[in-house]
């Protein structure tokens, strides 16, 4: 990846950016151990200096070497980070890499040469995540824009030449001052045709030729999931969607579209029970081979599986799909159903994918298993296999469900508490691509936080709006603090020995992916993480910018509440680290872009209390005092500027007496990694007089004995 230095954040006079990087001695970052206590404020000790550049490893504490806790001669305690287990993840094959979703376009045979065309893993499309839309509206499905574009291409190919030339001349005339290239001209012609009344009429006529698995017309095609879209999206129009060219020699016929799953809101909490039931549906598409009437049991038309891939829709003529056709007293499933049992204690997922076959004469419904699902849970994702239930040789001419997908299945839990799941698989012989989705049958009794991932808006420039200033926005994450997930854009946050680690992702060349889906991130992404000698393994935090929209962010893997590496329930601990924030006040402001500032916390696990302060280099009084109460593997509390009752925090030490007052901002925090060796949190504040977005991260300390 090409690394480009981040542009220094330009802050208006009304803003304060506090980049807190604890553990530094003056302007030079110290060795990570040992580190003096950042508080250092004794009752009778000397105030001392704020940590000069030659005071190695003294992070600007309020007392010098003689500032003890009760006597000027009491040496100040020194600390070092408690060793942290390496956060090493299992290597994952490309077919099982996590994503917000995946899809594959319906396969076609070239009718000129009629060569068998197996499915190809390389043609699986990484999707960007289900789009959140206004209440009462539907999220656009993957392949819907792709279908429109293919229809548009077919329409333009059949347009009268004189009509196309007229559009061309008009666009050229409108751009005389700055002539367009042929590529630019072609794109403008395409968009002009797209907006034309004539093409919109064609689009309207296509509505009754579009089929998707959540159209709500039958029980089989009603998928009432909130966080996941999945299934097929297909359109069939012989007039405009049949492609025939001489260069290259190509002839495709049949529907266009694809099969997919697409999720939003990756789970941050999961149930703790050993048997949570999920139910839903599944869908599939097959390869193509030069053989008519290929699957006798799956044949919407004889071309399915021959000219184009057969899909789950092609088996509907043999299934119970509609409630009006159910036998008397029937209370079973419809269409292609899926069922899963999840043991969250043992981190196992098992299930089955079924075809609910209906005898057209007796009306009897037979629930026929097509695949057994077996997977292991990793964070909020699962990986495993789909094993075909019917591998008999003579079944290959009846249906395509005869081959396994061993270690070629992946999926994840969606919804804040894992209310839904979805996944995909590709069989070993590249014959069938399947997707599935399901939701909990009943609400789980108890859940536990497994991770945090969020951004706190700071400020926006140039009409950018990815983040709302001083508002928390949940980010997606696949259970790995070292990977920042922004739709289909994933950035590896690999630590180095550098004081700051910077990462960038350039603006994508296209605003859409191969499924025609609009990308969530259409601008340059810039990330800074902070450590200053501390190698955070399970917690990452810092600055995150998408174009001109700026934020601070935090993500971490929560400590378990049970087991030998759980959050302690006895004893006390010191935590030291860093913080980064953005603060504004009425008529005052100051930029601290390169400040080396300290987050200092005392945790009492037995009494479940949190006491901390966020300090800035060269100042004796804290910027924020924080108190909180522990619950499970997290905590909540309040943050206030020091001396709030006396007029607030004097932001300018030069004597201008301009202050910011923040009282009782709500703080949320968590413990991360084995045995709670890392801890972090955040808060926002938004009033007319003062605003703040702050994140902090710390590591547990052990005292260094003389």
UniProtKB/Swiss-Prot annotation:
Cell location: Cell outer membrane; Cell surface
Membrane topology category: Lipid-anchor
GO CC annotation, single: cell outer membrane
Compositionally biased spans, kind Gly residues: 42-51
Bias kind Basic and acidic residues: ranges: 389-410
Lipid-substituted positions (S-diacylglycerol cysteine): 21
Signal peptide start and end residues: 1-20
N-palmitoyl cysteine lipid attachment residues: 21
InterPro entries reported for this sequence: OMP/PagP_b-brl, TbpB_B_D, TbpB_C-lobe, TbpB_C-lobe_sf, TbpB_N-lobe, TbpB_N-lobe_sf
UniProt-listed Pfam families: TbpB_A, TbpB_B_D, TbpB_C
UniProt protein name: Transferrin-binding protein B
């Amino acid at each position: 990846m090409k690394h480009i230095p981040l542009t220094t954040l330009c802050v208006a006079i009304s803003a304060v950016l506090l980049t807190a990087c604890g553990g530094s001695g003056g302007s030079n970052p110290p060795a990570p151990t040992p580190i003096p206590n950042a508080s250092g404020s004794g009752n009778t000790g000397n105030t001392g200096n704020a940590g000069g550049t030659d005071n190695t490893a003294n992070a600007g504490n309020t007392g010098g070497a003689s500032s003890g806790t009760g006597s000027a001669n009491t040496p100040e305690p020194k600390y070092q980070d408690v060793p942290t287990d390496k956060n090493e993840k299992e290597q994952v094959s490309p077919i099982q890499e996590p994503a917000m979703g995946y899809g594959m376009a319906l396969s076609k045979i070239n009718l000129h040469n009629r060569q068998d065309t197996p499915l190809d893993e390389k043609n699986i499309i990484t999707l960007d995540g289900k789009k959140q839309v206004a209440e009462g509206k539907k999220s656009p499905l993957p392949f819907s824009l792709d279908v429109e574009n293919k229809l548009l291409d077919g329409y333009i190919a059949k347009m009268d030449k004189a009509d196309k030339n007229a559009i061309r001349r008009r666009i050229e005339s409108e751009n005389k001052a700055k002539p367009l290239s042929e590529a630019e001209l072609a794109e403008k012609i395409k968009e002009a045709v797209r907006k034309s009344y004539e093409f919109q009429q064609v689009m309207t006529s296509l509505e009754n030729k579009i089929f998707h698995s959540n159209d709500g017309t039958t029980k089989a095609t009603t998928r009432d999931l909130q966080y996941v879209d999945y299934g097929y999206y297909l359109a069939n129009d012989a007039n405009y969607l049949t492609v025939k060219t001489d260069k290259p020699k190509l002839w495709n016929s049949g529907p266009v579209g694809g099969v997919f799953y697409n999720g939003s809101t990756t789970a941050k909490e999961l149930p703790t029970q050993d048997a949570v039931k999920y139910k839903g549906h599944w869908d599939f598409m097959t390869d193509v081979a030069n053989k008519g009437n290929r699957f006798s049991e799956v044949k919407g038309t004889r071309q399915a599986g021959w000219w184009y891939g057969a899909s789950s829709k092609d088996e509907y003529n043999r299934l119970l799909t509609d409630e009006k056709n159910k036998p008397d007293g029937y209370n079973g499933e419809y269409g292609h159903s899926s069922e899963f049992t999840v043991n969250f204690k043992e981190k196992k997922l098992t299930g089955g994918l079924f075809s609910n076959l209906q005898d057209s004469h007796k009306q009897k419904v037979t629930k026929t298993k097509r695949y057994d699902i077996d997977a292991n849970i990793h964070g909020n994702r699962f990986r495993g296999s789909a094993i075909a239930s019917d591998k008999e040789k003579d079944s290959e001419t009846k249906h395509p469900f005869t081959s396994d997908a061993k270690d070629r299945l992946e999926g994840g839990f969606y919804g804040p508490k894992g209310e839904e799941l979805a996944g995909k698989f590709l069989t070993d012989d590249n014959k069938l691509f399947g997707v599935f989705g399901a939701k909990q049958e009943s609400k789980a009794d108890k859940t536990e936080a497994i991770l945090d991932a969020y951004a706190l808006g700071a400020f926006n420039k140039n009409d950018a709006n990815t983040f709302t200033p001083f508002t928390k926005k949940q980010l997606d994450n696949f259970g790995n603090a070292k990977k920042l997930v922004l739709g289909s854009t994933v950035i590896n946050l690999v630590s180095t020995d550098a004081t700051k680690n910077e990462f960038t992702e350039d603006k994508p060349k296209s605003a859409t992916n191969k499924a025609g889906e609009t990308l969530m991130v259409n601008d340059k992404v810039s990330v800074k993480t902070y450590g200053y000698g501390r190698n955070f393994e399970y917690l990452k935090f810092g600055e995150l910018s998408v174009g001109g929209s700026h934020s601070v962010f935090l993500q971490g893997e929560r400590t378990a509440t049970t087991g030998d590496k759980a959050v302690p329930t006895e004893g006390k601990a010191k935590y030291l680290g860093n913080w980064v924030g953005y603060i504004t006040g009425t008529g005052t402001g100051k930029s601290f872009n390169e400040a080396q500032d300290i987050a200092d916390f005392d945790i009492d696990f037995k009494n479940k209390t949190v006491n901390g302060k966020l300090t800035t280099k060269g100042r004796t009084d804290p910027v924020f005092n924080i108190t909180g109460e522990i619950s499970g593997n997290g905590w909540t509390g309040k943050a206030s500027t020091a001396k709030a009752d006396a007029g607030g925090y004097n932001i300018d030490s030069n004597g201008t007496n301009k202050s910011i007052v923040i009282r009782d901002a709500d703080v949320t925090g968590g413990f991360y990694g084995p045995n709670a060796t890392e801890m972090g949190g955040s808060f926002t504040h938004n009033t007319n007089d003062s605003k703040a977005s702050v994140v902090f991260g710390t590591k547990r300390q052990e005292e260094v004995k003389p």
